[in-house]
């Protein structure tokens, strides 16, 4: 699968990030994060930029340890994509997922903070 990826320079909360991507005919990045080639490219870019970025995964459905990518696929808590000791508080208020600049891996955080955004669009072959 090929993807078009958009990295925003604007910061916004998680809900606004989803709207931002949708207004461009895209979605918060999710399926590209499960593609080994794409995830390497995305993480290489975010590492150079040194900012936190929203991705399309959250725990808003039930507040348990059940993170899902926005396309409905499970994001296991033992995934290699998580930063060390993360997710750390998904049963409380840390229900959304970012790429955390400290480790350049995923981190569960509150949904109201301002972060940059990564959008994706799957391209037809």
From Swiss-Prot:
What are the disulfide bonds? 21-119, 96-111
The domain of life for this entry's organism is Eukaryota
* SUPFAM superfamilies found in the cross-reference section: C-type lectin-like
Membrane-crossing residues?
none
- List GO molecular-function terms, semicolon-separated: carbohydrate binding
Ordered alphabetically, the record's keywords are: Calcium, Disulfide bond, Lectin
Q: Where does the C-type lectin domain start and stop, copy by copy? A: 1-120
Q: What does this protein do?
A: Role in the defense system of the organism against microorganisms. This calcium-binding lectin binds galactose.
Known partners and oligomeric status: Homodimer.
Q: What is this protein called?
A: Lectin
Source organism (scientific name): Polyandrocarpa misakiensis (Tunicate)
